[in-house]
Amino acid sequence: MGVIKNILLGLFMIGMLGVLGAQTAKVYPTKNFDRKGFYLDLRNEVMTVEAIKKFTKEIASMGLNTLVLEYEATYPYLHHATISNEVAYSRSEIQSLITYAASLGVEIIPVQECFGHVQYILRHDRYNHLSEDPKDNSQVCPLKIQADSLLFQDLFADMAAMHPSQYIHIGGDETYLLGHDDTCSAFAQKEGKSKLFVNYMKVMSEIVIKLGKTPVMWADMILKYPEAADLLPKQTILMDWNYGWKPNHFGDIGLLQQKGFKFWGASSIRSHPDNWYVTDWMTHFRNQRDYIPFARNRGYESMFVTSWSTSGLYSFTWDVGNDVLDMQPIRNNYPLSGYRILVAAYVQSLKQNHPLDGKNFVLTYAKDRFGLSESDGNKLWDCFQLAPELLVHGKPTKSTDIATMIRQNDKVREILHDINPKANEIEIQHFRLMADLRDYYLHYKAALARYNAPDFEIDSSNNLLPDVEALVAKGKELDRRFSTLNKGFLKDLEIKKQNKVRDKVVLQLLARLRNLKP
């Protein structure tokens, strides 16, 4: 009996050690990432230079030392000015920004996409011949390597000359058309998609290396197709992006680390499914909680948080011959101006040696930043837990009906409008506007559901028209609030564009209803 007792005691102690081990595994060393950075998306909702400088100063005060800028068509290309759009910065503005950031100890790393996500280049006749698919325009053909190299050598050289940073981010993510056209398909079938991808990115990386810089590329495609990874220069740094999914979502990270590749990490504070009318706050808090410890434990050298203004997917207005008349982002997020709390959550996660507790962080932030009581802090936390639900073809993805979604959002609106901050009220005003924009969206969808009802007839417009007219009036007030809150943060043209994007479908519905006459 004594033997059995000792065995049971031993098993109990082993079990306790396992429990303690699991608990202590949550406490990780505060590895001082070489670069603690922010990845700023300037493709859409384009910020003013003054706003970027102010933001740079703030993140520097928080302890960040790197700012990655994805310009797309807002960069003032020297020899390829065709690419630069109507809200592009001037070269003197970029130089001023780089100099200012350096004075704060912040290094600016430029992004120059060279494979996928190049709609902003391929939309132009000057470059369209490089497309994998002329009807898509999102990706260059990797087998047109000579012509591709001539273009991107110029673009990389421009970035290298402007930016003193040792690094150039060359993109390479989400190349969904890989092996799409006949020539590439035949190559992929014979040699594999990995070699098709790596052969191209190898050439792009070597161009950057010859410029005396270190290439950084997104890791998703090389993780998905790792077979030819050894052909890629080992100087190339792989940036693993994880916005809330399980590790190794794209592929085996350890395999590429064993091959000698260095990794940087990237979490997110604005990403899918975020848009104008919903923010998945809880996913973003959990993302910082889970991914930063993972990156530390895997030995990632640097850590960044991304903030996406859009998905990077676009809708086009085409003319005959696949000529592009217009290009619009499919998804627009609320501007970065409303997300300081998530930036702070990311920074706090970098500083501490245990995973972020989202609720405790929000309560502390509410007290320190807004002067809120614990009760109001808890209410703010409740607001962030609203399910990020949208509608698909007029139907809620989870709720029973639109009215239920409106009632849920009304609770959030009521809380936010009752909260009385003692400091930094502008930040609370952004939260209020987000909730009111969701209300605008839901009421539009409710009106649209009535418009699409099986019994909607020409006489039905008389009942629906007053509600839509009221919605248009509400939209104008929301536009005014949005313009006021983002004046000086976004470029004026961007403010007008974002208001127009939100209002367009409501105004279209109004015009149709007014035109319906017996």
Where are these regions (language model features)?
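Bacterial Sec-dependent N-terminal signal peptides
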Residues: 1-26
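A general structural-boundary detector
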Residues: 9, 25, 39-42, 157, ...
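Amphipathic alpha-helical coiled-coil/zipper oligomerization segments
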Residues: 23, 115, 474-477
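Membrane-targeting and insertion segments and their boundary/processing signals
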Residues: 25-33, 68-71, 126, 282, ...
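N-terminal small/glycine-rich loop or linker at the start of catalytic domains
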Residues: 25-43, 266-274
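Substrate-binding cleft of carbohydrate-active enzyme catalytic domains
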Residues: 31-219, 237, 245, 257
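Substrate-binding groove of N-acetylhexosamine-processing glycoside hydrolases
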Residues: 57, 96-99, 149-161, 165-167, ...
